[in-house]
Amino acid sequence: MLEIKELYKSFDGVQAVRDFSLALQPGKITSLIGPNGAGKSTVFNLVTGFLPYTQGTIQYNGQSLSGLTPWKIARHGITRTFQNLRLFRKLTVLENVLLGRQNQSGENVLNALFLFSNRSPEYQLQLEVSESLLEFVGLEDKQAELAENLSYGQQKLLSVACCLAAEPKVLLLDEPVSGVQPEMINKLTSILKELVNKQQKTIWLIEHDIDFVLKISDTVIVMDDGVIITHSDPKVIQSNSAILEAYLS
């Protein structure tokens, strides 16, 4: 279980995150919502090692994540996507996922790229896993395409596949359906539900699409000005017009 206690983060004396505490429910989908600047992405950056925190503790399965680099946290079983997609745009779709697999063997990027040029048993194994992930997200026919040539929605799917390549138990998704068409939202909804219901993944996401949030979430956390305002069932959030108006308008 991912457990955060009394987390603080300040930038030049300004508190961006204050007294943030959460025990993430395993095998569930938890959404973190709130206005721009509330501190949501900062929390994700703190949990995944992209920023150091000022005070507090973050533990996963009883082990402290303090001071760990993002790749070490990923090897603990926690991976993430970003609001601004971080793909290797000049590499193919398949190569992007293969690079995600390199965490499993401890290879660096250059070594992983070297694997692409041979047909070793290790390469074949990583190839099969990567192809199955692309099939899972519906990009099996785009393997040879450059990542930059995919539609924005397809790039979102690829980012999920890359996230899954490291075989995580917990996925942190930053605005997974932002800016995509309704049919792609439906596809991503189905993918995330299957990850939880059939693969026992735990998902924590940030999203501004309230309809998507209320439809998919088991728990919704509302955050503003660096603090948690409320933490509740989506039906309770949906019935609270004050919260919806104040934080999602």
Feature roles, as predicted:
Residues 110-142, 190-193:
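Conserved ABC ATPase "signature" region
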Residues 33-35:
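The feature captures the beta-strand-to-loop junction immediately N-terminal to the Walker
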Residues 171-175:
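Catalytic Walker B motif of ABC-type/P-loop ATPase nucleotide-binding domains
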Residues 56-64, 76:
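Conserved ABC transporter NBD signature motif
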Residues 48:
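Helix-to-loop junction immediately C-terminal to a conserved catalytic motif
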Residues 167:
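Conserved catalytic motifs of ABC-family nucleotide-binding domains
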